[in-house]
Design a protein with these regions (language model features):
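N-terminal Rossmann/SDR dinucleotide-binding element
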Residues: 1-98
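Amphipathic terminal alpha-helices
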Residues: 2-17, 23, 333-336, 345-369
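Active-site Tyr-X1-5-Lys
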Residues: 166-194
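NAD(P)-dependent short-chain dehydrogenase/reductase
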Residues: 185-251, 281
Length: 429
């Protein structure tokens, strides 16, 4: 197995003249953030890129035609990867000077044991493979959620914040363990490691925020503001996260001791009102801004009921916490130590995200209208139909409040049936 003992220095946009291109492996390269990183590295002309992911083969979207030339010139290659297969990891990573651990495979509907195996054990295997293959740099993309408990706001938080145990979000607990493993592996067998913690990533292909908003539109819930609507969040456009990865590589090349073994928050450096972000996205996609404020407690009880009904609410719960708490982060460490500055503003990022989803959403809108028309035919007209189909928003909202109030008093408040009886008398006369 050929090993690069020391990588050549990075150069500018014109590529390397007289030097062999560096080889990197992007684990999770077909995920949301991985695709962005591949595109950014291609523009540098400094890298041969190995895309490693769980899919059996590389299937390009119509928007990825730029990758065809790179595949033909062999600047890009695809490798199916199982993080639990050590021999496959060694084969994929071998001769790479840098490994970018960007994402995990789809983790929906998996049990704790499976999640732990993929995230924690998989990360251990990646680290071991990097050490055996004498990889120089391992950069892990984590999440700012690892220090956010969901119950308390964070104002200008720094990387010194401790990990938070979130019993309702096993995924983030396990990701915090994986992050810790990467940081602890620094400077063992000459491997330099670094962790990036982006805060609420968005962009073309976003698998969480935009699909969640579209689901809310579909079920008539996008008109609601949860809580007082005054909270502020830090977001980051996906291309800025990719740029931060490149900044870390350069920093590790030239200033190893100040960056290696550390974690850095990555944001757009533009704290943004959360509900303004939601409103701009919905308006850009052709929908009405949310205008009706509902108590956060009410929505939380609805999520608890969904959980009791064994409905997967992990994404909903995570976005609920973001929607009702302020979370702003201090990126001065990233600015000072890896010289990170966003290359795409919030305004441009929102605009490009909307444009990327418009075509998809136009197709989805037709299906949505069909569903509503079938429901309308089934329910017909009348008071009940008007309430269920959100034709009368005021009456629907009142019924919504009454139903959840009854659920709380009769089932969620901890009262017995007998102690709830006076309450029922009071409410029903």
């Amino acid at each position: 197995m050929a090993i690069e003992s020391s990588p050549p220095f990075l150069v500018g946009q014109d590529g390397l003249k007289g030097y062999k291109l560096r080889t990197c492996t992007i684990i999770g390269g077909r995920g949301f953030q991985g695709r962005s990183l591949v595109s950014c590295l291609l523009l540098l002309n400094d890298w041969n890129i190995r895309i490693a992911d769980s899919d059996p083969s590389l299937v390009l979207d119509p928007t990825e035609l730029v990758l065809v030339d790179a595949l033909n010139s062999r600047r890009i290659s695809y490798h199916q990867l199982n993080r639990l297969d050590s021999s496959l990891l060694l084969e994929t990573i071998g001769s790479s000077s840098a490994v970018f651990f960007v994402d995990f495979p789809c983790l929906k509907n998996l049990e704790f044991v499976e999640l732990h195996e993929i995230i924690v054990e998989g990360t251990k295997n990646v680290i071991a493979a990097c050490r055996e293959c004498q990889v120089r740099q391992l950069i892990f993309i984590s999440s700012a959620d690892v220090v956010f408990d969901g119950s308390h706001s964070i104002l200008n938080g720094s990387e010194s914040l401790p990990y938070q145990i979130r019993h309702g979000d096993i995924l983030m607990d396990l990701k915090a363990q994986a992050e810790s493993l990467v940081l602890c592996a620094n400077n063992i067998d000459n491997l330099l490691t670094c962790v990036l913690r982006p805060s609420t990533v968005f962009g073309p292909g976003d698998p969480d925020i935009i699909p969640f908003l579209m689901c809310s539109v579909k079920y008539g819930l996008a008109k609601f503001i949860v809580g007082d609507g005054e909270n502020t969040s830090d977001f980051v456009y996906c291309e800025n996260v990719s740029h931060a990865v490149i900044c870390v590589v350069k920093a590790l090349d030239y200033r190893m001791t100040s960056v290696a073994g550390k974690a850095f928050f990555i944001t757009n450096l533009e704290p943004f009102p959360f509900w303004k972000f939601v409103s701009l996205m919905l308006e850009g996609l052709g929908y009405q801004r949310p205008i009706i404020k509902i108590p956060a407690t009410l929505v939380w009880y609805a999520l608890l009921i969904s959980k009791c009904m064994q409905i997967n609410i992990s994404t909903s719960a995570r976005l609920f916490h973001l929607a009702t708490r302020t979370r702003t982060l201090n990126c001065s460490s990233a600015q000072n130590q890896i010289h990170y500055e966003p290359v795409v503003s919030m305004e441009d990022g929102i605009r490009m995200t909307i444009q990327s989803f418009l075509h998809t959403e136009q197709n989805a809108a037709f299906s949505e209208m069909e569903e509503h028309s079938k429901a309308a035919k089934l329910l017909g007209s009348g008071k009940v139909a008007d309430i269920l189909l959100w034709r009368d928003e005021r009456n629907t909202f009142v019924c919504f409040l009454v139903v959840f109030s009854l659920l709380y008093f009769l089932f969620l408040s901890g009262r017995t049936f007998a102690s709830s009886f006076p309450i029922r008398i009071r409410y029903f006369g």
